[in-house]
From Swiss-Prot:
Coiled coil: none
Species this chain originates from: Mus musculus
UniProt key word Hydrolase: no
Annotated membrane topology: Multi-pass membrane protein
Parts of the chain that traverse the membrane: 21-41, 63-83, 95-115, 163-183
Pfam families associated with the record: BCLP
Protein origin, superkingdom: Eukaryota
Record has Transmembrane helix as a keyword: yes
Protein name: Keratinocyte-associated protein 3
Lineage: Eukaryota, Metazoa, Chordata, Craniata, Vertebrata
GO CC aspect terms: membrane
């Protein structure tokens, strides 16, 4: 039994939706990259310990998030190309492969960010600054007091607030990337006629739409050339 909400790609509105999803993936991917860069520059570079090891929050929130953002931009570009070239199987397979990988990566990123936020909230941010404040794992000691406080080059209370303020938007954007990538997977499978979302006669409908669009494009080009020629003749008369 087909699910109309999932298998929503059709010949009439599917290409336009795929184009919008591609643009959304490019936008969300760039914003996620920006948030990851700000998170690294303002928070996470302070909590790396001198031995080169980093907290689990760093790995989940920065590395995976940045990778998901980069891949989302790539999926968005391929989706834009596929929406304008609906009869090219190579683009369909490329879209399916990249979207499936990005779906898994974005889902893993969302789960990792959710775990990082949960751990950070549960211990009040002490896990983030454990290397700088080795004696502050005791919840009864305030973050701005205790042994090791004078060794830190940053304000530990702001690290907690800033990390959460950047992690939570990144969490929602990663979830959005996963959802948009899922739509791209469904669209690619529908275009190839694979799975429960295949539609009989879809390729023929797309072929007819493509053939109808070509004369329209040529007509618009002819109109533009005619208007340009008329403007040029009017300009010549003005100079004369």
């Amino acid at each position: 039994m087909r699910c109309c909400g999932v298998c929503a790609f059709d010949a009439a509105r599917g290409p336009r939706r795929l184009m919008r999803v591609g643009l959304a993936l490019i936008l969300v991917g760039h914003v996620n990259l920006l948030v990851g860069a700000v998170l690294h520059g303002t928070v996470l570079r302070h909590v790396a310990n001198p031995r080169g090891a980093v907290t689990p929050e760093y790995t989940t929130a920065n590395v995976i998030s940045v990778g998901s953002g980069l891949l989302s931009v790539s999926v968005g570009l391929v989706a834009l190309l596929a929406s304008r070239n609906l009869l090219r199987p190579r683009l369909h397979w490329a879209l399916l492969t990249l979207a499936l990988v990005n779906l898994l990566l974005s889902a893993a990123c969302s789960m990792g960010l959710l775990l990082a936020v949960s751990l950070t909230v549960a211990n009040g941010g002490r896990r983030l600054i454990a290397d700088c404040h080795p004696g502050l794992m005791d919840p009864s000691i305030p973050l701005d007091q205790g042994p090791g406080h004078t060794d830190c080059s940053f304000d530990p209370t702001r690290i907690y607030d800033t990390a959460l303020a950047l992690w939570i938007p990144s969490l929602f954007m990663s979830a959005a990337e996963a959802a948009l990538s899922g739509y791209c997977c469904v669209a690619a499978l529908t275009l190839r006629g694979i799975g429960p979302c295949r539609k009989e006669g879809l390729q023929e409908q797309l072929q007819e739409l493509t053939e109808l669009e070509l004369p329209e494009c040529k007509r618009q080009e002819n109109v533009q050339l005619l208007h340009g020629r008329q403007d040029f003749q009017a300009l010549q008369k003005t100079w004369v």
